[in-house]
Amino acid sequence: MSEQRKESLQNNPNLSKKDIKIVEKILSKNDIKAAEMKERYLKEGLYVLNFMSSPGSGKTTMLENLADFKDFKFCVVEGDLQTNRDADRLRKKGVSAHQITTGEACHLEASMIEGAFDLLKDEGALEKSDFLIIENVGNLVCPSSYNLGAAMNIVLLSVPEGDDKVLKYPTMFMCADAVIISKADMIEVFNFRVSQVKEDMQKLKPEAPIFLMSSKDPKSLEDFKNFLLEKKRENYQSTHSF
């Protein structure tokens, strides 16, 4: 667990000392499992991406469209509180996907990924894939606290959410190895200021690239796909400390 995370917990007025110790224990246990999973990803030759965002930002639609590229082979772990709908959508596109329903939990944990990983391996999905994509539970808060051992953490911000979210949810955007502004075809409708997002990211994490993406603009997705392929070739590994 990072020093920043410890300090944040200790300064939380809603947590007692006992609560802080419990949370620290949970996060430390998750970090250990995340490190174990990272070793397993590398052993399988998988480049793992952790996609995080609010609900409805377009994560699943983006994955459906990525499935159309023949040079981008991937399988998926889906996280939602309830239903198998997102995994079912991806299976219809020919993507091997395992759904994790978390009940009331607003995030995925490394131990949850382990179970899904084993099932995908048993199905033979891992050996057919270059990437394992984790579509985290839709939430701009909780997932940013849990390391999943991914090579890259990618945050989507959809235009209808507004251009002020980066500094409102700094812990999430500090995780980002890349940021996608999704539903970019609606920028004018919502008076969305891309410049505001760029300015805020410069303050928070200037090295993270920002992509404008729209399902109506196939090239925007292709550019992002090529970026991911290049990062895999480089074997880029996130240095973010959860």
From Swiss-Prot:
Keywords tagged on the record: GTP-binding, Hydrolase, Metal-binding, Nickel, Nucleotide-binding, Zinc
GO molecular function: GTP binding; GTPase activity; nickel cation binding; zinc ion binding
Location of the region described as G-domain in the Swiss-Prot/TrEMBL record: 48-211
Residues reported in the UniProt entry to bind Ni(2+): C106, H107, C142
Gene Ontology process terms (BP): protein maturation
Binding-site positions, Zn(2+): C106, C142
Keyword Metal-binding: yes
Family membership: Belongs to the SIMIBI class G3E GTPase family. HypB/HupM subfamily.
General function of this protein: Involved in the maturation of [NiFe] hydrogenases. Required for nickel insertion into the metal center of the hydrogenase. Exhibits a low intrinsic GTPase activity, which is essential for nickel insertion.
NCBIfam families reported in the protein's UniProt record: hypB
Protein's name in the database: Hydrogenase/urease maturation factor HypB
Native species: Helicobacter pylori (strain J99 / ATCC 700824) (Campylobacter pylori J99)
Phylogenetic lineage: Bacteria, Pseudomonadati, Campylobacterota, Epsilonproteobacteria, Campylobacterales
